[in-house]
UniProtKB/Swiss-Prot annotation:
Cofactor annotation comment: Binds 1 FMN per subunit.
Protein name (Swiss-Prot/TrEMBL): Pyridoxine/pyridoxamine 5'-phosphate oxidase
Recorded family membership: Belongs to the pyridoxamine 5'-phosphate oxidase family.
UniProt-annotated binding residues for FMN: 66-71, 81-82, 87-88, 110, 145-146, 190, 200
Its biological purpose: Catalyzes the oxidation of either pyridoxine 5'-phosphate (PNP) or pyridoxamine 5'-phosphate (PMP) into pyridoxal 5'-phosphate (PLP).
Species of provenance: Psychromonas ingrahamii (strain DSM 17664 / CCUG 51855 / 37)
Assembly and oligomerization: Homodimer.
Matching PANTHER family: PYRIDOXINE-5'-PHOSPHATE OXIDASE, PYRIDOXINE-5-PHOSPHATE OXIDASE
């Protein structure tokens, strides 16, 4: 960590969450809260601040985690994209719940989201897919994600095959690729403090708004 980053980290540790529990009301919007923190992470220069860990479980309760990129967030939830034949997709089809974790170390902040997961529409998936670079779209077709690969050359040859197949053409959305939305059932914000008496707030949805509670560190 650079000297400037250390100063920034020390300063942030002393801040804590800049709101008190008494000021938090059910109408407070944790999505807005999240977007403010994400923008701060972007402005700080953190590389890929939209990266997040997603944890899934098999029906037998065996967890697995991996890093993915957040591609959209709104009042409905948090959206990411993947191959529907991947391990995480198989987990989600059988056990449609997940936990997300954002960790912005320099800011000493993290956000945890837990919730139910659903596929987004094919139209939404296609809109994002067509916005990707051509190489990424070819890669989506070429990769049998999470399946055993004999050697890298096999993958290279599949890429070449699809480059030739789609040469001069639009690349369609594969049936096995698309997005998921994590619909939050809880959103927890954590702000590190130098004395280790960290600030923690957890939001949970009600029928119309959100409840919010402060948690012990």
């Amino acid at each position: 960590m650079s000297f400037i980053s250390k100063i920034r980290c020390a300063f942030t540790l002393g801040q804590g969450v800049l709101i008190e529990n008494e000021a938090l009301k059910e109408t407070n919007d944790p999505i807005l809260f999240f977007n403010n923190w994400l923008k701060k992470a972007q402005d700080t220069g953190i590389i890929l601040p939209e990266s997040m860990s997603i944890s899934t479980c098999t029906p037998e309760g065996r967890p697995s985690s991996r890093m993915v990129l957040l591609k959209e967030v709104d009042s409905k939830g948090f959206v990411f994209f993947t191959n529907y034949d991947s391990r995480k997709a198989h987990d989600l089809e059988a056990n449609p719940f997940a936990a997300l974790l954002f960790h912005w170390n320099i800011l000493q902040r993290q956000v945890r989201i837990e919730g139910r997961v659903e596929r987004i529409s094919t139209a939404q998936s296609n809109a994002y897919f067509q916005s990707r670079g051509r190489g990424s779209r070819i890669g989506a077709w070429a990769s049998h994600q999470s399946q055993e690969l004999n050697d890298r050359q096999t993958l290279v040859e599949r890429v070449k095959y699809f480059e030739e197949k789609f040469a001069g053409k639009e690349i369609p959305l594969p049936e096995f690729w698309g997005g998921y939305r994590v619909i939050p059932e809880s959103i927890e914000f954590w702000q590190g403090k130098a004395d280790r008496l960290h600030d923690r707030f957890v939001y949970q949805p009600t029928e119309k708004n959100w409840t919010v509670k402060r948690l012990n560190p």
